[in-house]
Amino acid sequence: MQTQKTLRPYPGALLNPKVDPIFKSLFTQNTEESKAALTAFLSAILRQPIIDVTIGQNELPVEADDDKKTIFDITCKNETEDKFLNIEMQGQNDSDSFDNRSEYHVAHLLNHFVKKGMDWDEVPEAFMISVLNFVYDRTVDDGFLEYTMRLEDGKRLKSTRMKIIYLELPKYENIPDMPVEKLTTVQKWAKFFLYANRKEKSEYLKILSESEAGIMEAYKSLDSISQSEAEWIRETAYWDAISNKKTTIGTAERRGKRQGLKEGIKKGIEQGQRLKAI
């Protein structure tokens, strides 16, 4: 019997949750484990117990590899109020204006959910949560960055309605694989995202999952979508797109350098000819 070809590298291999569309697929499946994983992850990031989450219907399910479609809208509840969130995985920093992009998204989210005539005291909290597979701020060692509106003295809060949270995964690579009971919940989640698709970390990944119920649900959800050949095709297409993009940029840079060299030589010859004529 002929073995069916698959992009899955070996039985039991897991997809890479650091790939933007895979991250989204992990948390947006219509399954109990996917919802439980998302609820637990948000509870860890927001540092408060979240009791329910609802994903925007216009964003379900993942259907495109376009990076702009990897953000998904969430309404979540704690014991007292609703909160509105955009959440995403960002594999690359394509510009030096990532902070401007985050501000736009959180402002757009708040504007979308605040109804005309609403009492200002009823304006909900809006969050932009970005899990980053790159370092955004090299001036601090902490990989968990939270931004709110403050006065210029940096001490007094101006508003808590809009918040931006970055989880910089590369900074957690520096934390050794210590006994899991010594890790914070956020550190465990970061290591889950970092290690999920790495075969040599599979045993530590199991220990992580067994130590945190929410991460166990995330592991189950990731294992479930890893059975799908369509998801492996999506992940492969993602890496192909990145390679094509890098090649295009590299080619453009080399052409620019060659053109600049030609223009420099031409100007040098012209200057030399002018000097000879003096």
Model-inferred region functions:
Residues 1-278:
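Elongated, amphipathic alpha-helical interaction scaffolds
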